[in-house]
């Protein structure tokens, strides 16, 4: 996705704040702190198998986010999913 801002294999933000769905490309290993803070319309996100870390407040306030698969993630930051009131299912792997 062209609107993703990626530096050193870490998503640090996105230039579009009103997106509904998002696919993070393979090779990304981390989602930075506050990367998707208050993306209220984001309801679906596909994470790559290479993702290992989700930063502090990465998805905080993503009120429409319903499901997330974090099977390969080994570190989740503080308040990473705070305020995600529609989040009903999280798939964890053995790394957490």
Language-model segments: what does each one mean?
Residues 12, 33-35, 55-58, 77-82:
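Consensus positions within tandem repeat domains that build extended binding/scaffold surfaces
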Residues 1-6, 16-30, 39-53, 63-75, ...:
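Structural signature of tandem-repeat unit edges
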């Amino acid at each position: 996705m062209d609107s993703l801002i990626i530096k050193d294999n870490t998503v640090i933000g996105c230039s579009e704040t009103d997106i509904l769905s998002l696919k993070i490309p393979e090779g990304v290993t981390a989602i930075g702190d506050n990367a998707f803070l208050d993306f209220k319309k984001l309801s679906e996100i596909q994470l790559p198998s290479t993702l290992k870390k989700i930063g502090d407040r990465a998805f905080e306030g993503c009120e429409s986010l319903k499901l997330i698969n974090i099977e390969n993630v080994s570190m989740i930051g503080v308040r990473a999913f705070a305020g995600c009131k529609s989040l009903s299912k999280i798939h964890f792997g053995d790394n957490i």
